């Protein structure tokens, strides 16, 4: 597990921003992307990408591009991502799609906003729905630093970051 996931985590860490290109399957993330988010689920307990921004792109030949981008955009702040931009595009043809002017303008607007935000280094305030679990995990685990009977990686992680803020700066 670690050998597969760590290189991806390292790439995210070295990046200024991350573009996720996701497919839609039955109105949601595909099994492959769901497997990836499952492998990264420990990040909800030990987030770290506080200065990272994400652009989530989904095209679908029908419906549900929005629900697909929203699903990933709901997960990434728990990993620490500071801001998630979404670009859902619905194609009118599965085989011969040519982007409409509206879709091109939408893509340019999303890309420009993402780029300017990454370039600015601006930190956006986190939502209360992100702050509550962040502070809860920190408070619960710091007191368990010396836990011998049921040691967890969380109990080793959080004492090193005692007092860490979700969105420093």
What are these regions (language model features)?
Residues 2-82, 156-160, 164:
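Helix-loop-strand module that forms the ligand-binding subsite of alpha/beta enzymes
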């Amino acid at each position: 597990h670690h050998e597969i996931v760590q290189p991806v985590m390292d790439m995210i860490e070295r990046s200024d921003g991350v573009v996720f290109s996701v497919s839609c399957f039955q109105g949601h993330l595909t099994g492959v992307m769901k497997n990836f988010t499952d492998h990264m689920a420990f990040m909800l307990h030990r987030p770290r990408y506080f200065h990272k921004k994400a652009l989530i792109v989904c095209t679908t030949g029908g419906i549900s591009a929005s629900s697909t981008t929203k699903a990933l955009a709901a997960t990434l702040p728990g990993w620490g991502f500071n801001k998630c931009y979404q670009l859902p595009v619905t194609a009118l043809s599965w085989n011969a799609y040519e982007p409409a002017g509206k879709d091109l303008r939408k893509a340019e607007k999303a890309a420009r906003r993402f780029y300017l935000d990454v370039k600015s280094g601006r930190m956006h305030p986190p939502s209360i729905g992100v702050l509550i679990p962040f502070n809860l995990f920190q408070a619960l685990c710091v007191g368990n630093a010396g836990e011998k009977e049921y040691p967890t990686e969380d109990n080793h992680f959080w004492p090193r970051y005692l007092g860490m803020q979700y969105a420093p700066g």
